[in-house]
Amino acid sequence: NVTLVAHRGMRSVAPENTTASFAEAGKHGYWGAECDIYRTKDGVWIISHDSHTYRMMDKSAFIEKKTYEELMDMNVDNGVNIDKYEDLKICSLEEYLDICKKYNMTPVIELKGKNNTEYYSEIVELANQFEVNPVYISFHIENLQTMRQLTQCKMYYLVQKISEDDIQDAKSIENCGIDFNGNKDKNFKSDIIKKCQDAGLELGAWTINEEDALQKLEQYGITLITTDCIEYAK
């Protein structure tokens, strides 16, 4: 009964947040693929966990200070099985949505930082073009509030440890759940999960890589699971 989301694509077999990792997630039958987005200097939405290219690319730059063409001059040079992927480039939001559509996978898009909220309509337009129904997630409640004015898609407020305030914030946005750190014991030591469920909030957990952690969450009725490596049983 578990709904599995591949964290940054299937990063256990291919470099994270790339066309390769998203395609692998699709081939392995994941319900969703999670990604992180930034906007380039010339207005192209691209996929990267970090605001700069230092960790994953062969040249270092801040994404929002470079044009898409400048970023395409770089290659991905880090990540699992990188040797298999020569000339792997930064992935655009369009490429990611195209892969999600091809594999009937739900796009799970993290709205990073607090910049560029005035351009969120571009994201919604792209999703509409590809006829996909994304889930939007963010650690910043304001980002979700802005996005809610543009789309009725499902949303989750990302938190480390669930607080009473988080419950109220999520409740203030229609069709918004809470996606919490499922490895933090404090989330299980109080009745906070029950309070979320009593408030009618859907819950998800991240980043779950151990089967026992998964089983614990299932006991609490939490079935939306973001993972680096857990797969559906063959």
Please describe what each predicted stretch is.
Residues 1-234:
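Phosphate-group recognition and catalysis centered on beta-loop-alpha active-site segments
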